[in-house]
């Protein structure tokens, strides 16, 4: 097996200067506080998606502008849209109202230029937004496009975490990601579950991925599961129970098939242990 660290990719200096200037401006505006974030999101989305619009309110109110165009402009302001989590009975409406403008900016930025599959700038934009959305966000957070959250405010993220494209992080309960966690494309991490009898009966519990955990392509981790340090959930697996440290669990439901070869001796202990109670 060949060791292949990531390459450093340079962009033209002129583009890099614009990137730096805009990230600096974004961070300054974020620092002004939540009371300004609806306007912040609207201003940037208008600049990105409708750069010809110089007077937003006038254009939205103008009966000469086609209705569909006015609807598109309205949707650039987070106050004019609703997101699915706003309909959940367990939402903290005040906390969500605080982060909603930044979530809407994040999601919509991903669907227009210069977002999407571009890496150089969008990773920095998401890194700037995340500390203002999450309960905690460590250093060097790296997130690719089309990642979605439930509430956002129940995310606890360590250092050097990488989340790849099209991941769902359902933080209706709490999701804790330790240092150096890697979540691959199309994975789903849940922290709530529904009764099989009554769909409206919902249980939310913390889901924990400890340090150096890897959740691989299209895998799912269900609510309340703890993946231990250096544990791994294989491609397309569904983790319904805890994954022991250093173990590789695969299949549906996911079961341990091996221990990583660099694991310490105690990782090979196989006796059954009692499942820990859910964290408060």
Label every model-predicted segment.
Residues 136:
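Short proline/glycine- and basic residue-enriched helix-capping loop/turn segments at helix->loop/beta transitions
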Residues 182, 214, 232, 238, ...:
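Short-chain dehydrogenase/reductase
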């Amino acid at each position: 097996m060949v060791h292949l660290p990531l390459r450093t990719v340079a962009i033209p200096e002129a583009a890099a200067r614009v990137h730096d200037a805009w990230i600096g401006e974004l961070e300054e505006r974020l620092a002004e506080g939540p009371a300004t974030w609806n306007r912040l999101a609207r201003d940037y989305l208008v600049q990105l998606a409708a750069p010809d619009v110089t007077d937003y309110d006038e254009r939205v109110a103008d009966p000469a502008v086609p209705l569909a165009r006015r609807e598109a402009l309205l949707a650039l302001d987070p106050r004019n849209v609703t997101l699915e989590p706003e309909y959940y009975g367990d939402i903290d409406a005040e906390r969500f109202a605080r982060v909603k403008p930044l979530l809407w900016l994040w999601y919509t930025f991903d669907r227009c230029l210069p977002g999407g599959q571009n890496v150089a700038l969008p990773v920095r934009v998401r890194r700037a937004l995340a500390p203002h959305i999450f309960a905690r966000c460590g250093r060097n957070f790296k997130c690719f496009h089309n990642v979605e959250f439930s509430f956002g405010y129940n995310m606890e993220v360590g250092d050097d975490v990488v989340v790849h494209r099209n991941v769902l992080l359902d933080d209706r309960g709490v999701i804790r990601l330790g240092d150096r966690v890697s979540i691959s494309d199309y994975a789903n991490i849940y922290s709530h579950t529904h009764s099989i009898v009554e769909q409206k009966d919902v249980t939310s519990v913390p889901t924990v991925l400890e340090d150096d955990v890897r959740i691989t392509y299209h895998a799912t981790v269900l609510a309340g599961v703890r993946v231990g340090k250096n544990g791994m959930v294989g491609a397309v697996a569904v983790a319904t129970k805890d994954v022991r440290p250093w173990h590789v669990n695969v299949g549906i439901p996911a079961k341990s098939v091996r221990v990583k070869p660099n694991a310490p001796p105690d990782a090979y202990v196989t006796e059954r242990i009692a499942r820990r109670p859910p964290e408060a």
